[in-house]
């Protein structure tokens, strides 16, 4: 998923902050963000992360909701930013809560979450 999709899905689940990743909407006005939402929601639906209803309701699928919520409601997180031989490695963030550990890998335009 994209960073914007991740933040929109997390927001739909009630998150006000997503620690460990840069704000993908930084520099955008409220109007620009609002205009971009339908396209972001459509992309999330195409990836199977969410469902769009006929009444334009938008809901996050159960598996995606479980993993994203574990990140946003974590007890703590660890961010790893590494440079090897002058080449920046993808950012990795480990989120830890009572029963879950989730690894986020941020490769700029693509974010993967792994249990």
Protein language model annotation of sequence segments:
Residues 1-45, 51-55, 59-65:
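Short, amphipathic alpha-helical interface elements at domain boundaries
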Residues 51-101, 107-115:
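Accessory beta->alpha helical hairpin/"wing" motif in late/C-terminal subdomains of nucleic-acid enzymes
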Residues 12, 26, 30, 47, ...:
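Arginine residue identity/basic-tract feature
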